[in-house]
UniProtKB/Swiss-Prot annotation:
Binding locations of [4Fe-4S] cluster 2: 18, 37, 40, 43
SUPFAM superfamilies: 4Fe-4S ferredoxins
A Pfam family the protein falls into: Fer4_7
Keywords: 4Fe-4S, Electron transport, Iron, Iron-sulfur, Metal-binding, Repeat, Transport
Domain 4Fe-4S ferredoxin-type: 2-27, 28-55
Name of the protein in its database record: Ferredoxin
Entries under PROSITE patterns matching the protein: 4FE4S_FER_1, 4FE4S_FER_2
One term of GO molecular function: metal ion binding
């Protein structure tokens, strides 16, 4: 599953790109529900700061 690092700038690009929508705004960065993540990499491909990383 992917997770979002502290590099996240909360731009929302990953949330709109994800085909299964496990991404949501968190307290300071977006968060990914690891159980719902299908590991497609769409979030990582669109992120301008490479915040989504694969576990």
């Amino acid at each position: 599953a992917y997770f979002i690092t502290d590099a996240c700038i909360s731009c929302g690009a990953c949330e709109s790109e994800c085909p299964v929508s496990p991404i949501s705004p968190g307290d300071s960065v977006y968060v990914i529900d690891a159980d719902a993540c299908i590991e497609c990499g769409a979030c990582a491909n669109v992120c301008p700061v490479d915040a989504p990383q694969q576990k």
